[in-house]
């Protein structure tokens, strides 16, 4: 039985890019249940990635995306998803080179050599 915390992300669009496919698959290979919440029908998710409708977390307002950006909406989605599911948020371009620690409640990705935190990987 897999005891690792699940990881999850959001995709707004119909097709994943090759890099996103590789990165999502890396989490599957590391042993994490990997969920991709989608605003559109996506048919090229890697094997092992569970595709679910983004509406399970929140409705995706296309007018808001058009007026701001998908990134803006993704920021709101990420924290709602963490609150509702307890999964670790991963950006679709975050590669997993080792499983996330099972005994850590808080997980944050680092950015660059300075060690600054970013919101591309977040577990709360």
Each predicted region: which residue ranges?
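Short, polar loop motifs at secondary-structure junctions
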Residues: 37-43, 94-99
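Residues that flank catalytic or metal-binding motifs in active/ligand-binding sites
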Residues: 3, 30, 117-118
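Short, hydrophobic beta-strand segments that form beta-sheet elements in well-ordered domains
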Residues: 31-39, 88-90
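Active-site-proximal specificity loops/subdomain of glycosyltransferases
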Residues: 42-80
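Short, well-formed alpha-helical segments that are part of the catalytic scaffolds
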Residues: 15-29
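N-proximal low-complexity "stem/linker" segments adjacent to membrane-targeting elements
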Residues: 1-18
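GT-A fold catalytic core of metal-dependent nucleotide-sugar glycosyltransferases
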Residues: 70-124
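Short, charged, surface-exposed secondary-structure boundary motifs
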Residues: 19-20, 46, 59-65, 116-122
């Amino acid at each position: 039985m897999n005891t690792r915390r699940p990881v999850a992300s959001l995709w707004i669009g119909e097709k994943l890019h090759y890099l996103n496919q590789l990165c999502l698959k890396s989490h599957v290979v590391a042993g994490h249940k990997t969920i991709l919440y989608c605003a559109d029908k996506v048919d090229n998710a890697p094997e092992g990635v569970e595709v679910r409708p983004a509406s399970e977390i929140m409705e995706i307002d296309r007018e808001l995306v058009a007026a701001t950006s998908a990134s803006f909406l993704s920021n709101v989605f990420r924290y709602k998803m963490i609150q509702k599911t307890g999964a670790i948020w991963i950006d679709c371009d975050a590669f997993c080179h080792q499983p996330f620690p099972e005994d850590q409640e808080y997980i944050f990705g680092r950015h660059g050599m300075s060690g600054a935190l970013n919101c591309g990987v977040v577990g709360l």
